[in-house]
């Protein structure tokens, strides 16, 4: 019997500082349907900036 596919989807968090840096993570589309915004560290400019969700190509 095959295992059911989960609700989690892989996403990319892209820096709003336009440095090109990004993090990859997963999120549950059922519990959190809106786009994610989170403040994380950008090592290129060595500051905490807001990262916004983008699709992984």
UniProtKB/Swiss-Prot annotation:
Record-level GO cellular component terms: cytosolic large ribosomal subunit
InterPro entries: Ribosomal_bL33, Ribosomal_bL33_CS, Ribosomal_bL33_sf, Ribosomal_zn-bd
Keywords per UniProt: Ribonucleoprotein, Ribosomal protein
Keyword Isomerase: no
GO molecular function: structural constituent of ribosome
Pfam families referenced in this protein's UniProt entry, alphabetically: Ribosomal_L33 (PF00471)
Gene3D superfamilies documented for this protein: Ribosomal protein L33 (2.20.28.120)
Sections of the chain in a coiled coil: none
Highest taxon, organism lineage: Bacteria
Biological process annotations from GO: translation
Family label: Belongs to the bacterial ribosomal protein bL33 family.
Protein name as annotated: Large ribosomal subunit protein bL33
Species of provenance: Shewanella baltica (strain OS155 / ATCC BAA-1091)
Gene: rpmG
């Amino acid at each position: 019997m095959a295992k059911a596919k989960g609700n989690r989807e892989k996403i990319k968090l892209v820096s709003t500082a336009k440095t090109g840096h990004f993090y990859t993570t997963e999120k549950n589309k059922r519990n959190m349907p809106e786009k994610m915004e989170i403040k994380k560290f950008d090592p290129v400019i060595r500051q905490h900036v807001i990262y916004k969700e983008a699709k992984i190509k």
